[in-house]
């Protein structure tokens, strides 16, 4: 039986894989986007979305509709779909789905700490957190003054505790330390998720490893570019690079020595797919940003996950494609609301 994993994959996971493939069929097409960008008002946008799989998800919202309400409802719909899958998942799929939520938990913790640093009330901040990364202790984050307090009082009983070992210090939480904590948590998270996927092996590893390798490398590039002109030393910068990407080890060593954007671009030149991304990015009006090029490549990798069956990668890919779809709809909605149509086509097409 071990020679035919698909025979027993469907016993525990067949229903959910069928479900996620059905949900993926409802991802907006290019024709849908062409309709959305022609909308004159957010009410028009709502009507067009009703003709898609989103249906009446905005039916109970009073006029005038706002972009923030659309954003909240998009996230809410995605979370309902995800939690349905999580509630019906057996191990090891249950743990795999939990791993997907950890990145949102990290983002929520950082958002709460940063907001508290700027004297924002916790009641104002919690609604801004992503519902996929919510956890019981979230509202107590504002009591922590140092990373050690943050860990001991709040995060020790959450899944993030395992990723926090390299962040514990008695230094005060300031802007620089918060960014270091964010990137250290993401490094530990990505390396742990990568290890989990390699242990699962098979088609899941084949689908997930390239996706996580790209995510690790993207973070290394962005950390390097964002560190220019800051107080972050090259040694500290190197400690933040995830070690599960294709850049490890030679590319990361070169990034650690980089002094400007051109030197980062030179590192990318050694990796054909990254070279293409950097060459396609520019800072002139009408050019795509490097971030957009990264998003496009991420969409491409996630679409590839659906080409094979009997693996968990489709669940991760679906969440990431829906996340990009939410960004696209919110971008179009913002352009309509602000009557700034010149850049309305700057969304990332999926299908």
Curated annotation (Swiss-Prot):
Keyword Cell membrane listed: no
Gene3D superfamilies, per database record: ATP synthase (C/AC39) subunit, domain 3, V-type ATP synthase subunit C domain
Subcellular localization(s) per the UniProt record: Membrane; Lysosome membrane; Cytoplasmic vesicle, Clathrin-coated vesicle membrane
GO BP annotations listed: cellular response to increased oxygen levels; cilium assembly; intracellular iron ion homeostasis; synaptic vesicle lumen acidification
Tissue specificity comment: Ubiquitous.
Entries under Pfam families matching the protein: vATP-synt_AC39 (PF01992)
Keyword terms, alphabetized: Cilium biogenesis/degradation, Cytoplasmic vesicle, Hydrogen ion transport, Ion transport, Lysosome, Membrane, Phosphoprotein, Transport
Keyword Ion transport: yes
Domain of life: Eukaryota
SUPFAM superfamilies (UniProt xref): V-type ATP synthase subunit C
GO cellular component annotations of the record: apical plasma membrane; axon terminus; centrosome; clathrin-coated vesicle membrane; early endosome; lysosomal membrane; proton-transporting V-type ATPase complex; proton-transporting V-type ATPase, V0 domain
Residue numbers carrying Phosphoserine: 283
Modified residues (Phosphotyrosine): 270
Protein function: Subunit of the V0 complex of vacuolar(H+)-ATPase (V-ATPase), a multisubunit enzyme composed of a peripheral complex (V1) that hydrolyzes ATP and a membrane integral complex (V0) that translocates protons. V-ATPase is responsible for acidifying a variety of intracellular compartments in eukaryotic cells, thus providing most of the energy required for transport processes in the vacuolar system. May play a role in coupling of proton transport and ATP hydrolysis.
Family, similarity comment: Belongs to the V-ATPase V0D/AC39 subunit family.
Quaternary context: V-ATPase is a heteromultimeric enzyme made up of two complexes: the ATP-hydrolytic V1 complex and the proton translocation V0 complex. The V1 complex consists of three catalytic AB heterodimers that form a heterohexamer, three peripheral stalks each consisting of EG heterodimers, one central rotor including subunits D and F, and the regulatory subunits C and H. The proton translocation complex V0 consists of the proton transport subunit a, a ring of proteolipid subunits c9c'', rotary subunit d, subunits e and f, and the accessory subunits ATP6AP1/Ac45 and ATP6AP2/PRR.
PANTHER family for this protein: VACUOLAR ATP SYNTHASE SUBUNIT AC39 (PTHR11028)
Protein name: V-type proton ATPase subunit d 1
The organism of origin for this protein: Mus musculus (Mouse)
Gene: Atp6v0d1
């Amino acid at each position: 039986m071990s020679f035919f994993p698909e025979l027993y994959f469907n016993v525990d996971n067949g229903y959910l894989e069928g479900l996620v493939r059905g949900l993926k069929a409802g991802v907006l097409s290019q024709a849908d986007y062409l309709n959305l960008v022609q909308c004159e008002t957010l009410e028009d946008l709502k009507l067009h979305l009703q003709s898609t799989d989103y249906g009446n998800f905005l039916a109970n919202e009073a006029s005038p509709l706002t972009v923030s309400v659309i954003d909240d409802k998009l996230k809410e719909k995605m979370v309902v779909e995800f939690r349905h899958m999580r509630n019906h998942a057996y191990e090891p799929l249950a743990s795999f789905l939990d791993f997907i939520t950890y990145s949102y938990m990290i983002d929520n913790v950082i958002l709460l700490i940063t907001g508290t640093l700027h004297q924002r009330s916790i009641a104002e901040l919690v609604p801004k957190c992503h519902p996929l990364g919510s956890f019981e202790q979230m509202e107590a984050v504002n009591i922590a003054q140092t990373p050690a307090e943050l860990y001991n009082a709040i995060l020790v009983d959450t899944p993030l505790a395992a990723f926090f070992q390299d962040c514990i210090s008695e230094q005060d939480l300031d802007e620089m330390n918060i960014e270091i904590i964010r990137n250290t948590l993401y490094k530990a998270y990505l390396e742990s998720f990568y290890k989990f996927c390699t242990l699962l092996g098979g088609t899941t590893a084949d689908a997930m490893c390239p996706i996580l390798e790209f995510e690790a490398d993207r973070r290394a590039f962005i950390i390097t570019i964002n560190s220019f002109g800051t107080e972050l030393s090259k040694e500290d910068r190197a400690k933040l690079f995830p070690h599960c990407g294709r850049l490890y080890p030679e590319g990361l060593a070169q990034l650690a020595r980089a002094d400007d954007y051109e030197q980062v671009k030179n590192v990318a030149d050694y990796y054909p797919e990254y070279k293409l991304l950097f060459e396609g990015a520019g800072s002139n009006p009408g050019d795509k940003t490097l971030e957009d090029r990264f998003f496009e490549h991420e969409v491409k990798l996630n679409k590839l996950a659906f080409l094979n069956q009997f693996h968990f990668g489709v669940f991760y890919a679906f969440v990431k494609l829906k996340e990009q779809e939410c960004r696209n709809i919110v971008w179009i909605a913002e352009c309509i609301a602000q009557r700034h149509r010149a850049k309305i086509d700057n969304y990332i097409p999926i299908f």
